[in-house]
Amino acid sequence: YPNVKAWLKPANSSEQIEFPRPMLSYRVGGGGGSSVLNTDDHYSYIIGYKDGYLRPYGTITRGEVATIFFRLLTDEARDKYWSQTNNYSDCNSDLWCNNAISTLSNMGIIDGYSDGTFRPYGKITRAQFAKIAVGFFETTTQEYQGYYSDISENAWFTNYVEAASRVGLIQGFADGTFRPNVNITRAQACVIVNRALDRKPATEHLLPTAKMINWPDCTPSDWYYADMQEATNSHDYRWLASGGDAKAMEKWTAKLPQRDWAAFEHAWSTAHSAPGGEVIK
């Protein structure tokens, strides 16, 4: 909705009271999920640094984002859109994230810059990340709503940001802004990825600390704690109902072995005969 604030006049009073627009938190609900993302298996999809830290306030690169979503595709989608080639001048077959970039480009999820580059080591902004995340959902272009005070009607990213808001992937800040050109943090990115996967972690329903991978810069008092634990710990779960929602939140039931994504991608790569081609039988 476009209003940033409202003024209400209490009964029997001549004074007006200002009410800022509330900032709502969304989750993707039933029926609004993605058909090409693996929403069933709760695999971890990021790892920490060699020094043992997760750096939730650190930035994330375009190549890393492509790799995360590539790993989280359904097997059917990955098979259908598999590619090892692309038209970017800075993404050749030797690039560590080439398969991810090529496949997601083939899906139409990501694209590059007007100079023909993709810039895999470049940082990614909040608007760019929103565009990628909402690309996995079927959405329709709607009239400009003005959800955020710093998103103009004619900006290149407006339709993507507003669509991502409508399907419940993103939210803005308490001051009514979205800050589209600010680089997204690792914590913010994981929150959006979890929403895209319809994952609903809650701190009180995780496993005991001793049974999880933990991080010195990610503690239960941090706002991003549950989402970062979700992103870094593979686990089994069951759904908990609340308020008529059968899938209101997830309760972890067991820690699973971490998936070896490098080995997984190698096996998938060798199983294909050609970029975008058939699986070798």
Please annotate each region the language model reported:
Residues P2-S13:
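Serine/threonine-enriched low-complexity regions used as flexible
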Residues N12-N98, N106-A127, V134-N159, I170-I184, ...:
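Feature responds to low-complexity, polar/acidic, surface-exposed segments characteristic
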Residues K131, A163, V191, D217-C218:
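Predominantly extracellular/luminal carbohydrate-interaction, adhesion, and secreted-enzyme modules
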Residues A187-N194:
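Alpha-helical segment that forms one wall of the substrate-binding/catalytic cleft
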